Amino acid sequence: MKKLFTMLTMAMMALTFTSCEDEYIADTLEGTWTGNMYISSEWDGRYYDATSTEVTFLRDPFTYTSGTGYWVDYYSNAPWDYVANHIDWNVSNGVIRVYFCEEGTRIEIRSFRLNHNRFVGTIYDSGNLVDFELYNVSRPYSYWDDYRWGYDSWYDDYYYWARTRSGDADSTKVIEKPKRVVRPALK
């Protein structure tokens, strides 16, 4: 009986000391972040570097450590203005995993520092590593952000790829969408 009591006590202590770190990370991550993810896109044999990135993490209220959102990379010298994706994300054992729904690709974010204002870390994509730095621009449920100001049509056309901007583009030509890549910084 004493052995059973000892085992139950050990089990209860283990449950008591279980970390809630993943829930804390997901809670802090929720919101819209902007900055530079140092992401590139390959298209037609050329690489184009994103000038900035905006990521919105929306937390699932029933699972606490996962959710959906949007990831938009903006470009200035590419045949398109931006590449937008829906994302599914989760936090497990301190690692943030992001799945790009339209592209069918995944990345991991590890070795990061995160607070309510700044998100700095490393993206892992098939052996490629790149550091990033994002800043929080909006957070749901904040006392100063309780209203939606105006109308924003950005959410109405997130499924579509930007058309080419060149004037001589053939409108009947099917344009292949760019492929997101993570390239290590050139030294």
Predicted feature residues:
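C-terminal motif of bacterial Sec signal peptides marking the signal peptidase cleavage site
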Residues: 15-19
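N-terminal helix-cap/turn-to-beta initiation motif at the start of protein domains
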Residues: 20-34
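Sec-dependent signal peptide hydrophobic core
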Residues: 5-12
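Beta-sheet ligand-binding and adhesion/scaffold domains
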Residues: 95-187
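Generic short beta-strand segments
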Residues: 34-41, 66-74, 122-126
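Positively charged n-region of N-terminal signal peptides that target proteins for export
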Residues: 1-4, 187
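N-terminal glycine/threonine-rich, aromatic-flanked beta-hairpin/loop signature
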Residues: 46-95, 179
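Transition segment at domain starts
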Residues: 32-38, 43-52
